[in-house]
Design a protein with these regions (language model features):
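A residue-level marker of the well-folded mature domains of exported/periplasmic proteins
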Residues: 1-175
Length: 175
């Protein structure tokens, strides 16, 4: 089970825990890691164990083709949640994910609406290579490249950790 990264994540995990219970006829197995290779290995082990479903919130968007193909070949339903994976749509049953690119676009539009003379941005990202990191970053980078008064002064990952994000901001303020 992942740590509480957001209210959305907390709610969806709570819902999964309420639905996928022994009382409802499920034997739930969970695995959490921010490392894609560890997630891939765990998913492959779950396939070997003969699970009926894989519910995946991927650390990274890539590297999942072979595992999801294996799941499909073994009749295992795959559901993506929270984050998208860059694979053929036929390899998963459904995706209940956020539109990360739209979130990035909305953030950029909000910043533009401030009508500042200069934008000196501390860009704190999630796990590198994740759908959230890529989708939210691309609109910002496009705007920075298009406007002379937009500058990213620091761009670092906090890997979904609020304390790390605060440390990054404090170090920029104190420098």
């Amino acid at each position: 089970i992942p740590p509480s990264e957001s209210g959305y994540r907390e709610a969806i995990v709570k819902d999964f825990e309420a639905v996928f219970t022994a009382e409802n006829g499920y034997e739930a197995k969970t695995f959490y890691s921010l490392k894609n290779d560890e997630q891939l290995a765990a998913a492959q082990q779950f396939i070997t164990d003969g699970v009926d479903y894989l519910l995946i919130s991927a650390a990274e968007t890539t590297g999942w083709d072979a595992v999801l193909q294996s799941a499909q070949e073994n009749g295992i339903g795959v559901f993506l949640f929270d984050r998208m994976i860059a694979v053929d749509e036929s390899l998963y049953t459904a995706a209940v994910v956020s539109d990360m690119a739209n979130q990035g676009k909305l953030a950029v539009e909000w910043l533009k609406g401030l009508n500042l003379e200069a934008y000196n941005i501390i860009h704190i990202q999630g796990a590198m290579g994740s759908d959230a990191q890529i989708g939210r970053t691309d609109p910002l980078v496009a705007q920075v490249n298009a406007a002379d008064n937009w500058k990213i002064v620091v761009q670092q990952t906090a890997t979904w950790d609020e304390a790390t994000a605060k440390q990054i901001v404090e170090s920029v303020i104190n420098s």
